[in-house]
């Protein structure tokens, strides 16, 4: 599976792989892609890349606010990029959707996409993503046979508060089966607590950030200024009656996958 390299792929992913080709004149295909500027409005999350289920730590969310504006969120697994509701300009022409975003004054990302089908539940697509440094192309990636699913839940506000819980699956790379506690704040930071002598002690990490976009929860933290930055990715399955459930599709080193689960209770 090709690796996602930047948030703009959140925009870019919106259309799968493959170099853009002209729209089909087939009437049936046309029926599946008409009124894209209306159907595309809303929040979408990548579900499959190149025909394979997408691990959670590769997932991106993109929200189309209108036919001309969007924003995307991605905690990039391959770089230091951290994009929380990053904005992008959109141009829609038939089933061709182009997204343009500026990472800074020097780096521009352009994604040309072709939507094959779009419904109220999902869309299948292709994409051709290019990144430019001072006008010079430095990266070009194409994706084929991608699928995005529409996201109706948004837990950005519901997660705020203090939660205690542990992993509920037999396997997960991030947790040890012990109880853990997190306090998620409205400003996009959090406090992690560990238990010492039956008392919860707040950590003093120099960085502890998180974002929720739809159901995607991403965190990053550093213990000290000189330590490596660590990241974690989950999908919020539900928040109801003071109970929050997470799940994540993880990939082992041998390429096989498993589903990790986590459950916690709100304590304040």
Regions found by a protein language model. Give the residues of each.
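Ser/Thr- and Asn-enriched, surface-exposed coil loops between beta-strands
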Residues: 68, 93-95, 117-123, 213-215, ...
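Hydrophobic helical h-region of N-terminal Sec-dependent signal peptides
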Residues: 9-17
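Tryptophan-anchored aromatic micro-motifs
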Residues: 36-55, 148, 152-175, 208
